[in-house]
Amino acid sequence: MQYAKISGTGSYLPANRVSNDDLAQKVDTSDEWITARTGIKFRHIAAENEKTSDLAAEAAHRALDAAGLDSGEIDLIIVATATPDMQFPSTATIVQQKLGITNGCPAFDVQAVCAGFMYALTTANAYIKSGMAKNALVIGAETFSRIVDWNDRTTCVLFGDGAGAVVLSASDTPGIIHSKLKADGNYLKLLNVPGQIACGKVSGSPYISMDGPGVFKFAVKMLSKIADDVIEEAGYTAAQIDWIVPHQANRRIIESTAKHLGLSMDKVVLTVQDHGNTSAASIPLALDTGIRSGQIKRGQNLLLEGIGGGFAWGAVLLQY
């Protein structure tokens, strides 16, 4: 049986690191307030000349190095992002060009906001299991600093920029064991960016609009449910999970999922304090951090899970 296994990971964070105290000088907030409610202490903000594709390409280079592959061996590129470089072409094709890949491999974007990496990873898994690809580059990359209203203290403290990437390769040994994706558009008003560009004009707000309590309540409920579903459908138990690698949006949401599964926070890769919410980039960023720190080891079982606007959510159970 053919599996899709992670052969390398990489990540990239912009140099500009912004603390809660830095933000407190611009909006009415404090380090204590932000930390108590979210667990966030820092976030990274892209430079004016840094685009989402730049962050993605840097993370991709590091993932390729870790996998021991040349960029020309990649035969599929999927970029999960809600902040593309431009309306079109896809950010994935721009990354393809920046990596010097000229073999004509498919390259496209997936937009499921904070669940985007789950959607992209599941799609790449299907390509590999069907024999349509051997080495897929799956990237989550965001520049959310460009869609945040920096005068809105309820949202500007939450988000950061960054990118994470994995190389997913065909393997005879288990990699991705099971995944599940869900969506419900009935909740779109809880979290969105309503602005549109039409006929050369911007209509609606170009900034993130969020009902914080509504998002929290829905996220806690659905992440617990999908974690249960993926583990049970794979024939596993929560006790067999070595690490949870969650979407890094809010420490309290992460703690809730771990508690529901009966797992301690010692089994959670936690980066929200250093990165903030980087949307589609958060899970691959956390995954790469866990691997490079030595926390995550080969052969261990990982549960990746996340939820984003739409709502869209998903979980992936894999053996690293």
From Swiss-Prot:
It comes from the Bacteria. InterPro entries: ACP_syn_III_C, ACP_syn_III_N, FabH, Thiolase-like. The active site is at residues 114, 247, 277. It is found in: Cytoplasm. The keyword Acyltransferase applies. One of its GO terms (cellular component) is cytoplasm. Its EC number is 2.3.1.180. It catalyses: malonyl-[ACP] + acetyl-CoA + H(+) = 3-oxobutanoyl-[ACP] + CO2 + CoA. Its main location: cytoplasm. Belongs to the thiolase-like superfamily. FabH family. HAMAP family: FabH (MF_01815). Homodimer. Catalyzes the condensation reaction of fatty acid synthesis by the addition to an acyl acceptor of two carbons from malonyl-ACP. Catalyzes the first condensation reaction which initiates fatty acid synthesis and may therefore play a role in governing the total rate of fatty acid production. Possesses both acetoacetyl-ACP synthase and acetyl transacylase activities. Its substrate specificity determines the biosynthesis of branched-chain and/or straight-chain of fatty acids. This is Beta-ketoacyl-[acyl-carrier-protein] synthase III. It comes from Neisseria meningitidis serogroup B (strain ATCC BAA-335 / MC58). The gene is fabH.
